[in-house]
């Protein structure tokens, strides 16, 4: 083509307008750069304002020792009979997630041990009827080390000392334990042993892909340690939409049956993205109660604004 003269290399020479560059007017990027600079380097020549905080109103510290609770009931009955005891209760049981998933979701797991220690004993006395306190596992373990420069084991021992009457619960990522890779079976087993020894009573075990193979070792070791294996199925999709037939009601019922057969003491529904609609919660809990003879524990998130209604329908 060059030999025939159809193409040449004179385009730039013949188009001088290419060098008439317009001044950049990307104000959005400039603003972002300024914000980033101030965030990282602080104000140049300006005194940063000191934020003012409202005084903290501490919950009342009731006199006397905490009343006996679910911790004593588990120690008395053991995991198997304790599971049956849960099913016999005429009222709904509640887990408080303030010390784990709440601050993990709201501000990157940055709640410090010292702040929780100030109220732990008051919670034990003021809320002795709670089923459990989710206070460990998930991202709390690595964040304590990497960002807060704290010892998560000391935090757990503090909880056990100050809350002797309520079950302490953690989130365990199956073969990933509290890390972000797969660990050898003996590592997972030893971690569970030490977690139980230092205070954990309920292990909520899950795998992001609902793979039972990734949860079997954890379930087995939790049972070996005489603790409660609350095994979770992760919810996604929309079981109310017939067009979404991969993760439908039959899929979750089948997963629930597999988890029950694997040794779960409690079956959890882990709605980590807050996708479970109210009517879907009713349908799913109803189907699982018909399929397995286990307590059902629902965990969801409020991102959609539907969580309280989903809980209400699940209770129905």
Language-model regions, residue ranges each:
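Alpha/beta enzyme core
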Residues: 32-35, 89-94, 111-135, 145-167, ...
């Amino acid at each position: 083509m060059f030999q025939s003269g159809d193409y040449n290399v004179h385009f730039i020479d013949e188009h001088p307008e290419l060098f008439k560059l317009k001044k950049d007017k990307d104000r959005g990027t400039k603003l972002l750069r300024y914000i980033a600079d101030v965030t990282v380097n602080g104000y140049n020549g300006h005194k940063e304002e000191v934020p003012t905080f409202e005084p903290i109103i501490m919950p009342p510290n009731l006199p006397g020792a905490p009343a006996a609770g679910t911790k004593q009931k588990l120690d008395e009955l053991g995991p198997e009979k304790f599971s049956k005891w849960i099913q016999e209760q005429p009222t709904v049981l509640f887990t408080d997630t303030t010390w784990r998933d709440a601050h993990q979701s709201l501000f990157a797991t940055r709640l410090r041990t010292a702040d929780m220690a100030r109220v732990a004993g008051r919670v034990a006395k003021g809320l002795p009827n709670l089923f459990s306190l989710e206070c460990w596992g998930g991202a709390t373990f690595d964040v304590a080390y990497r960002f807060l420069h704290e010892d998560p084991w000391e935090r757990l021992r503090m909880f056990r000392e100050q809350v002797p009457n309520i079950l302490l619960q953690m989130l365990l990522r199956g073969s990933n334990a509290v890390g972000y890779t797969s660990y050898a079976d003996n590592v997972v087993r030893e971690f569970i042993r030490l977690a139980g020894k230092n205070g954990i009573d309920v292990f909520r075990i899950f795998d992001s892909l609902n793979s039972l193979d990734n949860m079997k070792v954890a379930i087995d070791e939790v049972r070996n340690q005489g603790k409660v294996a609350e095994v979770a199925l992760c919810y996604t999709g929309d079981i109310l939409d017939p067009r979404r037939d991969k993760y439908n009601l039959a899929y979750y019922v089948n997963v629930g049956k597999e988890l029950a057969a694997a040794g779960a003491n409690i079956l959890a529904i882990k709605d980590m993205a807050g996708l479970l609609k109210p009517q879907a919660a009713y349908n799913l809990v109803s189907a699982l109660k018909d399929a397995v003879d286990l307590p059902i524990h629902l965990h969801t998130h409020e991102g959609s604004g539907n969580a309280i209604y989903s809980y209400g329908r699940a209770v129905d």
